């Protein structure tokens, strides 16, 4: 798990989040995501639950880097996407592969998805949603059209404000410090 901060005079890390083309089929062991934990501290009880359980993402998928952003980094990111202020803590799952074939034409700006835990006030409910989220990622990490699976899950669960497809993410909006 990576903790990104800019203390001690180290140069600021810059993420080059550009989707890759994939030649091989996806497997459960294929690196698929960059996982970002964004948390400004608005919802302390839910933040505590997430921070206690986010290591599970790394345990389930050590091939996917997990970045725990500092409060300052989280604020800087949310300044670029103010519509998400107050919805953190959130887990951003950046998909490193472009969708193949027709799906890339249907969703040309697809970049991944996120779980907005800040809209939940009860820590136990947040933990249950985090567990469902990890189960969703586990079941669908080899899907050719992950955005289709997200849409299907949204329709099934009716959680349109909980898990959202990141359609308009640009390098600048995900340039995290």
Language-model-detected regions and their locations in the chain:
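A short acidic (Asp/Glu
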Residues: 45-50, 77-80, 102-104
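Hydrophobic beta-strand residues in large extracellular and virion-surface proteins
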Residues: 35, 66-68, 91-93, 115, ...
């Amino acid at each position: 798990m990576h903790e990104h901060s800019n203390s001690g005079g180290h140069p600021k890390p810059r993420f080059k989040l550009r989707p890759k083309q994939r030649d091989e089929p996806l497997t459960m062991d294929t690196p698929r995501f960059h996982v970002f934990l964004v948390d400004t501290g608005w919802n302390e009880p839910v933040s505590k639950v997430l921070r206690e359980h986010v290591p599970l993402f790394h345990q389930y998928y050590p091939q996917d880097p997990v970045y725990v952003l500092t409060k300052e980094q989280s604020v800087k990111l949310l300044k670029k996407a103010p519509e998400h202020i107050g919805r953190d803590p959130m887990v951003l799952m950046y998909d490193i592969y472009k969708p193949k074939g027709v799906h890339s034409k249907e969703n040309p700006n697809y970049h991944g998805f996120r779980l907005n835990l800040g809209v939940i006030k009860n820590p136990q409910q947040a933990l249950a949603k985090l567990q469902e989220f990890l189960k969703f990622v586990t079941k669908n990490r080899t899907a050719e059209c992950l955005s289709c699976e997200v849409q299907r899950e949204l329709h099934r669960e009716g959680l349109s404000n909980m898990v959202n497809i990141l359609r308009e993410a640009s390098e600048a909006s995900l340039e995290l410090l």
